[in-house]
């Protein structure tokens, strides 16, 4: 996608202490084959029968599935997505259908990148896609979503559609001598001026309706990770503006169709670092009651720059892909160890007590096709 995509990737781009923590690559975890093609900035979900579906992102319009209950597990290609290639969509299973919300892409080879507000659903029984007769209340890119029940999904966060789209329109229209000025003007603003979405939306697939469920207790974010367990929502880090992350983790309870926000927590600094920059594009999921968060990416030093008044906070800083894994154990966050390689912007899927990390972007910015997993077992973190 040329210069537009390069800029997009740039932008987007002590109770617990008594627990024995170890890293091992052997044990009980399930081994899955690599996905057929490298995947980053894609999306995925798992149905009630243990079948994982992943696609979009660098896979273009391709989608694949794998049945975790089969003895011989292989990826199978399903019908291609009809809505065009796109990145950063969110997908969940509702009423036995795979729903795909929003994303960012190009309508044709000549058009600039733009945010989508459309919704598609896939029938595994018929192997068919259908565009749903609805649009989201705001454009959805950099958003996150969690399934509430068989008919409802919670969606929040994401960039401001109009500001985001305008940036890529300006980049497309600028000649080479003007591009750096456009880029600087876009990044050199305080976080509040990006108007990231902080409204929480509930989509009801049965009624095909959208509902405003309130707002986040703090700033809107993009590129956050989210998980739902026993009616408790965890919204993990994300960008406050392009290049600047937050280390805050929002926590809420979903009860009687109402979201109640609880006390926030913060991810601890990585070993050897003075502060936690926060993560975008991290993997996350629960294993035996422990919330695990790993990978993602940030710009070390951007937070201090922003505190010092430098709005283009990541200017001149190399993006760093992370390999640290953190665990929330008995209400306390702790460092658990390292992944096999630094990785972010892949797909997290939980099944039983395993968290599968599918695809992602490595430290060279390249998509990978590997599938690894996190599992807590007898007080140990197994990475396979």
Curated annotation (Swiss-Prot):
GO terms for cellular component: periplasmic space. Kelch repeats lie at residues 51-95, 97-149, 151-184, 185-230, 233-282, 304-353, 355-384. Residues 1-29 form the signal peptide. Gene3D superfamilies: Kelch-type beta propeller. Its EC number is 5.1.3.24. It is an enzyme of class 5 (isomerase). Belongs to the NanM family. HAMAP family: NanM. This is N-acetylneuraminate epimerase. It comes from Salmonella typhi. The lineage of its organism: Bacteria, Pseudomonadati, Pseudomonadota, Gammaproteobacteria, Enterobacterales.
């Amino acid at each position: 996608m040329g210069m537009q995509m390069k800029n997009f990737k740039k932008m987007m781009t002590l109770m617990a202490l008594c627990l024995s923590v170890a890293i091992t690559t052997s044990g009980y975890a399930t081994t899955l084959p690599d996905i057929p093609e490298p995947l980053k900035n894609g999306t995925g979900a798992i149905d009630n029968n243990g079948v994982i579906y992943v696609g979009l992102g660098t896979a273009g319009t391709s989608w694949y599935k794998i049945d975790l209950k089969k003895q011989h597990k292989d990826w199978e290609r399903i019908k291609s997505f009809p809505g065009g290639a796109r990145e950063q969509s969110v997908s969940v299973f509702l009423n036995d259908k795979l729903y795909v919300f929003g994303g960012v892409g190009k309508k044709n080879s000549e058009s600039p990148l733009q945010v989508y507000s459309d919704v598609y659903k896939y029938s595994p029984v018929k192997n068919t896609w259908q565009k749903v007769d609805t649009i989201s209340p705001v454009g959805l890119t950099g958003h996150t979503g969690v399934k509430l029940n068989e008919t409802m999904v919670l969606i929040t966060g994401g960039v401001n559609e109009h500001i985001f789209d305008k940036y890529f329109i300006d980049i497309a229209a600028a000649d080479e001598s003007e591009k750096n000025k456009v880029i600087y003007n876009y990044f050199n603003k305080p976080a509040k001026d990006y108007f990231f979405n902080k409204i929480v939306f509930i989509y009801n697939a049965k009624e095909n309706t959208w509902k405003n469920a309130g707002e986040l207790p703090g700033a809107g974010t993009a590129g956050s990770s989210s998980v739902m367990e026993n009616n408790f929502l965890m919204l993990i880090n994300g960008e406050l503006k392009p290049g600047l992350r937050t280390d805050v983790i929002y926590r809420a309870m979903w009860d009687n169709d109402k979201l109640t926000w609880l006390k926030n927590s913060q991810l601890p600094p990585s070993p050897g670092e003075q502060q936690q920059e926060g993560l975008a594009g991290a993997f996350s999921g629960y294993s035996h009651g422990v919330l695990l968060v790993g990978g993602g990416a940030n710009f070390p030093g951007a937070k201090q720059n922003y505190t010092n008044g430098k709005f283009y906070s990541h200017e001149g800083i190399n993006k760093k892909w992370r390999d640290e894994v953190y665990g929330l154990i008995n209400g306390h966050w702790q460092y658990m160890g390292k992944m096999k390689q630094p990785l972010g912007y892949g797909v997290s899927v939980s099944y039983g007590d395993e968290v599968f990390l599918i695809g992602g972007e490595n430290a060279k910015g390249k998509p990978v096709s590997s599938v690894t997993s996190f599992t807590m077992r007898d007080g140990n973190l197994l990475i396979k």
